[in-house]
UniProtKB/Swiss-Prot annotation:
This is Ribosomal RNA small subunit methyltransferase G. The gene is rsmG. It comes from Chlorobium phaeovibrioides (strain DSM 265 / 1930) (Prosthecochloris vibrioformis (strain DSM 265)). Specifically methylates the N7 position of a guanine in 16S rRNA. Transmembrane segments: none annotated. The keyword Cytoplasm applies. It comes from the Bacteria.
């Protein structure tokens, strides 16, 4: 219990430092979600089982960082592409109750876990769907999010048909990204469906846990 309290205090401190406004209720829900994520992870492989840092910080707080580069607006529609255990969709749904989130994953067990956690948290602005992104038809989103390790070129190909005009693809990624960014931009010069610009925001200054981590913002012309 003491460790959980310490992690909760650290979450509050990080949010304050980054200018992320968080209510007591949201804080409690984020802490509860981290607990559920760890519990479900013993049954379904949602996150690494060899964590060297608190799940509440490494995964849950990390999932809030797109708010540093994107203003989530009331009524906005957001797709979480390859959500896994609900990351980043569930933490952001907690923070932005007036934004609608659709979480998709091709692994049924992960979606079962996400749906159960969404229900237990009482989130009415998020739902989880077992499907492949290629099978999403007739839907359009203001913003698409992903924590997947897939190259930006591949994620862009999935995202483009599902983005509304002036939409953004926001990815939480790590490592040396220049090669995959260059590949995506080259495709953008040759054909539609790829971003016209890509911006990077390093987040290592937020915490050493996120050294070599960056937020990738891909925009379509």
């Amino acid at each position: 219990m003491k460790q959980q309290n310490n992690d909760g205090d650290q979450l509050q401190s990080f949010c304050t430092n980054e200018g992320i406004q968080i209510t007591d209720e949201q804080h409690q829900l984020l802490v509860r979600y981290a607990q559920m994520l760890e519990s479900w992870n013993t049954k379904v492989n949602l996150i690494s089982r060899k964590e060297d840092a608190p799940v509440l910080i490494r995964h849950v707080f990390h999932s809030l960082l797109p708010s540093l580069v994107h203003n989530f607006r009331d009524g906005e529609t957001v797709l979480d592409l390859g959500t896994g255990g609900g990351l980043p969709g569930i933490p952001l749904a907690i923070m932005y109750p007036q934004v609608q989130f659709l979480l998709v994953d091709s692994t049924g067990k992960k979606i079962t876990a996400c749906s159960a956690m969404i229900e237990e948290l009482g989130l009415t602005n998020a739902r989880a769907m077992h499907t492949r992104v290629e099978e999403l038809k007739g839907l359009a989103f203001n913003t698409i999010l992903s924590r997947q390790v897939a190259p930006l070129k591949e994620l862009s190909r999935y995202a483009a048909p599902l983005l509304k005009k002036n939409g953004e693809l926001i990815c939480l990624k790590g490592g040396d990204l220049q090669k995959e960014i260059d590949e995506a931009l080259r495709e953008g010069k040759k054909r539609k469906g790829f971003p016209g610009s890509v911006t990077l925001k390093p987040i290592g200054e937020v915490s050493p846990l996120f050294n070599e981590k960056q937020i990738v913002i891909a925009r379509w012309r």
